[in-house]
Amino acid sequence: MRRGVEEAEIDRLPIDLLAHIFSLITCFRDLAQASRVCRKWKQGVEESLARREKLSFSGWKMDDESTTRLVFLAYSLKELDISRSRWGCQITDYGLHQLSTAKCIGNLSSFSLWGSTGITDKGVIQLISRATSLEHLNIGGTFITDASLFAIADSCPRLKSLVLWGCRQVTEDGLRTVVNKCRKLESINVWGMRVPLNCFTALLTIRPALQIEPKGVVTVVLNENRFPIWPIY
């Protein structure tokens, strides 16, 4: 009898309250367990995800399926972080292709794929073609090439910051194209890239107010005319 009373009390909780409670939970494992309690709790978990404007999978062991399943429920999402961490967010081109069909992708203002070594230009281009509202993009530590930058230049007119940390297959052509076409671009991180210093001179010629990170690059550009010695990883 006692068990029946407890279930009745749970049933009396309104969905809005359940959704609010679940929105305070940051552990996706806990959310998954809560969704299995009963049908009403599952609905509460789904509504809590639908209200979220930020999702970060950094630090969680996610794959294409689990990532896309959660993002598909997050209709109001504005900021998405699926950076690879020590546990590894194993997103691939297939996952990016699936994400590109999510309802929230067109409204994303911030997206991080930092360190996602399982992705290539193919997946990035597919997703970027739909993420046309991006203002902040981090694709550092990946193996993208100029092809991805050309897609960014064509699809992201609102872009303000771009992190290309360690993207050693990107060349001067890709950088110039992005800076030239993304007219709202304010900062770009080029740490660890294999490009000559005169490339940065060209970028500053196109957009004098552009902040090039790390900050020391601009100082060297203004005082020397040689190739930078970037750290090897």
Each language-model region and where it sits:
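N-terminal adaptor-interaction module of cullin-RING ubiquitin ligase components
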Residues: M1-D93
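C-terminal capping region of solenoid repeat domains
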Residues: M1-G4, L17, G44-V45, D64-E65, ...
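Acidic/polar low-complexity surface segments
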Residues: R86-G88, L99, W114
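Conserved hydrophobic beta-strand positions in leucine-rich repeat
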Residues: L55, L80-S83, L108-L113, L134-I139, ...
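Short loop/turn motifs at secondary-structure junctions
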Residues: R51, S76, C104-N107, S133, ...
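Intrinsically disordered, low-complexity regulatory regions of eukaryotic transcription factors
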Residues: F22, T26-R29, S100, I128-A131
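Residues that line or immediately flank small-molecule/substrate-binding pockets and catalytic motifs
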Residues: I25, G59, R84, G115, ...
